[in-house]
């Protein structure tokens, strides 16, 4: 089957030529029929993928979680498989794949939020604001991989809890929330293990929420989330569902796998076994060296 490598120039920066050459070398070694599409602007992603939608290919994101998300949103409904070469900043989707010992070919769940899709995590509240503010912090003196931590500190001082309500068959809540997280995968924020027991093929979304937390309690909770031990915390509530509706008092940013959408109403539902994951560890390890 043809392998289509979608290379995100912005994820690679100076490594673009090196990674592209490695892909060519490895594909020749493994006798893989391949095409490389280099994306220089986000709005060119759709055009690059359009010619592959009416045939069956393996579409491989060469980038981070944002690249995976944009490819997913363009190939849903087609017969294409989805793969990833993790060369982005966070690579949380790939971390989840490794932790779950995913097969080389495996049908996995996808979630739909309004008219978009996500494969890993959607979050509202302080988590989403941290992710959004990371893109604002463009000081070149701060290494890219440290900008999330800088944003975490910046957001800590600026953040105000969100007025919201959510409804599912399993639970209904309203009030002020510090965070609401809907997890299909396990990690977000570059290695924070928000949903340590989540599975891509269990047919369920894991929902976590914290109501109106005081700021002095946040550092301790963040440390627990990093370790994946927060499920025992009294500040965090969890349940599982297949569908949830969230309404917010004001327009609010929702972070979905490194991208953002803004609205006051969000309907999220699970689409079981909606896409085939291609997890060729030999290919990935050889390309990454």
Explain the meaning of each model-derived region.
Residues 138-146, 196-216:
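Gly/Ser/Thr-rich active-site loops/lids in small-molecule metabolic enzymes
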Residues 65, 180:
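Short conserved active-site loop signatures built around small residues
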Residues 160-162, 176-178, 201-206, 240-244:
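A generic structural signal for short beta-strands and their flanking turns/coil linkers
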Residues 168, 174, 199, 210-289:
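ATP/nucleoside-binding phosphotransfer catalytic cores, i.e., glycine-rich phosphate-binding loops
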Residues 123, 127, 181-194, 260:
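Glycine-rich phosphate/pyrophosphate-binding beta-alpha loops
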Residues 66-70, 92:
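Short glycine/serine/threonine-rich phosphate/pyrophosphate-binding segments
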Residues 1-59, 69, 77, 171-172, ...:
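ATP/NTP phosphate-donor binding region
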Residues 6, 37, 79-178:
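Catalytic core of DAGKc-family lipid kinases
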